[in-house]
């Protein structure tokens, strides 16, 4: 079977007895099982230890990230599928937090175990489409940031990305309208009308930036126990720190790392092999290349050219001076590269 390895992983998870579900982007499960996008699993918080033990037993490795990518109640795990030759990335959530990028300060207070079902096409437990649609509406509303560069440049009607449109269309065709109304009445009573307003705007293709800001305000003010907003001063400071440290973002795995050396004569394929491996691993991990051969760039070329010119003109001391600078430049470049290198191990 095409996805036999990842299918077996989920069979083990299903048989473990640990409550979990895939709670978002279930329209894209075919892409996830092919190893081309991530899985987002919501796991019972009381079963964390058992679930993590099973992941390690199955060959997963926990991926760590710098502060800018750390979110409350979420961990990352990687699994190499040698059948597909892909790295599967699992986002493991122990509570449902969402919100603006880098912030994620809104907690959805709901017992997901009441709403889990088996997917019809893949061996995975998913959240029922009515809850997924409600969550997608709330995520879309509160992810909107008027000050984001994309929205400032648009200055017009708000537009959703294609992947989100695909999710909305899939869910709107999959939901049971009566079930949807029952869930909204019982679990989202205080904000159900705002959720319905957004769905109506989506169906009429009339989602405006003003409408999104209005919905953010109304839901925040009208919310009962469905959502919990973290707006403390300390949390705002954490958001500011994340924003400032994003440029230093790094991903690594728990077991440390490994240095892979490629040695060979010119033309043996070292560069192409390194590029292929670097591209593959960089999809999920921070990897740096350290070149120990002759540095060839514009500065080195210019210094060598000046050395050659003065040598031709019989100014040997000046020529040697520039040759010395070539050596210093190459050495400094290698030191700089060595400090940047992140060691990885798979």
Which functions belong to the PLM regions below?
Residues 1-39, 43-258:
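Conserved NTP-donor binding/palm subdomain of two-metal-ion nucleotidyltransferases/polymerases, i.e.
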Residues 262:
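Hydrophobic anchor at the beta1->P-loop junction of P-loop NTPases
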Residues 265:
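P-loop (Walker A) phosphate-binding loop of NTP-binding proteins
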Residues 270:
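Conserved lysine of the Walker
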Residues 273:
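Hydrophobic positions on the alpha1 helix immediately C-terminal to the Walker A/P-loop
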Residues 276:
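Active-site signature of alpha/beta-hydrolase-fold catalytic machinery across serine-
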Residues 284-300:
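Short beta-strand-centered segment that lines the nucleotide-binding/catalytic pocket of NTP-utilizing
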Residues 295-346:
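ATP-dependent small-molecule kinase phosphotransfer cores
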């Amino acid at each position: 079977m095409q996805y036999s390895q990842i299918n077996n992983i989920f069979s083990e998870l299903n048989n473990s007895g640990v409550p979990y579900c895939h709670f978002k982007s279930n329209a894209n499960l075919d892409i996830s099982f092919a190893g081309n996008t991530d899985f987002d699993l919501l796991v019972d918080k009381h079963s964390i230890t058992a679930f993590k033990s099973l992941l390690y037993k199955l060959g997963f490795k926990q991926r760590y990230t710098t502060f800018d990518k750390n979110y409350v109640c979420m961990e990352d795990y990687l699994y190499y599928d040698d059948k597909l030759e892909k790295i599967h990335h699992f986002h493991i959530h122990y509570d449902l937090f969402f919100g603006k990028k880098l912030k994620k300060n809104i907690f959805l207070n709901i017992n997901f175990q009441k709403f889990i079902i088996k997917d019809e096409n893949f061996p995975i437990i998913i959240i029922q489409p009515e809850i997924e649609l409600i969550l997608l509406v709330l995520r879309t509303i509160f992810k909107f940031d008027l000050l984001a560069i994309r929205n400032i440049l648009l200055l017009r009607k708000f537009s959703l990305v294609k992947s989100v449109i695909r999710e909305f269309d899939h869910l709107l065709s999959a939901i049971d309208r009566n079930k949807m109304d029952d869930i909204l009445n019982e679990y989202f009573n205080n904000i159900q009308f705002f959720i319905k307003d957004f769905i109506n705007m989506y169906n009429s293709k009339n989602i405006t930036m003003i409408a999104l800001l209005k919905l953010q305000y109304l839901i925040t003010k009208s919310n009962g126990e469905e959502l919990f907003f973290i707006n403390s001063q300390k949390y705002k400071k954490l958001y500011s720190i994340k924003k400032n440290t994003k440029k230093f973002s790094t991903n690594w795995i728990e077991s440390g790392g490994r240095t892979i050396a490629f040695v060979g004569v010119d033309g043996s394929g070292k560069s192409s092999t390194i590029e292929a491996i670097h591209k593959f691993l960089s999809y999920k991990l921070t990897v740096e290349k350290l070149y120990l051969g002759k540095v060839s760039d514009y500065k080195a070329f210019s210094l060598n050219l000046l050395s050659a010119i003065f040598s031709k003109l019989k100014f040997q001391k000046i020529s040697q001076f520039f040759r010395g600078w070539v050596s210093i430049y190459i050495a400094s470049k290698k030191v700089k590269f060595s400090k940047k290198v992140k060691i990885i191990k798979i």
